[in-house]
UniProtKB/Swiss-Prot annotation:
Listed transmembrane segments: 73-93, 125-145, 173-193
Membrane association type: Multi-pass membrane protein
Protein name stated in the entry: Mitochondrial import inner membrane translocase subunit Tim23
Gene: timm23
Record function comment: Essential component of the TIM23 complex, a complex that mediates the translocation of transit peptide-containing proteins across the mitochondrial inner membrane. Plays an essential role in early embryonic development.
Mutant lacking the gene: phenotype: Mutants show various developmental defects including reduced tail circulation, and smaller head, eye and body.
Originating organism: Danio rerio
Length: 208
């Protein structure tokens, strides 16, 4: 019996050798020396050029036709929640200050602690409700104006801020409406100016 192995450049046996269609066998050592001229190395798992997987900037997977910046509706949740948390934190500190001031003549006892705790709870809830209501009005007006105009720019911000101030102070009569509108116009105008400060200085603005 001949136990000799065929040479690396031989042909596969079987049906291929019978019909004369055998394919030559090459070892990995022989294939490793074959130059791949003009070809990029491919990932063995993805079968793509790995250079396409290296991104210099952040890229997000977006649906077709979607914007890379968040709209008014997406920002509304963050705005309302952030204002409620900010109002609660500010109200808590203000209530603690007021409670300590009003009970400074009382000795440290349970009645004083209860009074301070009541003041903290009341002020925190009041400020959270106030700022949350303002944020809700601002978000509703912003989304409505964006849908009506079909565009998202600083004009929407200023208009939404002005209308928010007018509605929030509408219980104070015409003077209250005018005062609230001016306050909303000033605050939204300052925010728009701050948001475009890099653009005014000649730099490319960053959108979030």
């Amino acid at each position: 019996m001949d136990n000799s192995t065929p040479p690396p450049g031989g042909f596969k046996g079987g049906l291929g050798s019978i019909f004369g269609g055998g394919t030559p066998e090459y070892s990995n050592t022989e294939l490793s020396g074959v130059p791949l001229t003009g070809m990029s190395p491919l990932s063995p798992y993805l079968n793509v050029d790995p250079r396409y997987l290296i991104q210099d900037t952040d890229e997000f997977i977006l649906p077709t036709g979607a914007n890379k910046t968040r709209g008014r509706f997406e920002l509304a949740f963050f705005t309302i929640g952030g204002c409620c948390i900010t109002g609660a934190a500010f109200g808590t500190l203000n209530g603690l200050r007021m409670g300590l001031s009003e009970t400074r003549d009382m000795p440290w006892s349970k009645p004083r602690n209860v009074q301070i705790l009541n003041m903290v709870t009341r002020q925190g809830a009041s400020w959270a409700n106030t700022l949350g209501s303002v944020a809700l009005l601002y978000s509703v007006f912003g989304v409505a104006i964006e849908k009506a105009r079909g565009a998202e720019d600083d004009l929407n911000t200023v208009a939404a801020g002005t209308l928010t101030g007018m509605v929030f102070k509408s219980t104070g009569g015409l003077k209250g409406v005018a005062r609230g509108g001016l306050i909303g116009l000033a605050m939204s105008g300052l925010y728009a100016l701050y948001n475009n400060w890099d653009h005014l200085k000649g730099k490319s603005p960053s959108h979030y």
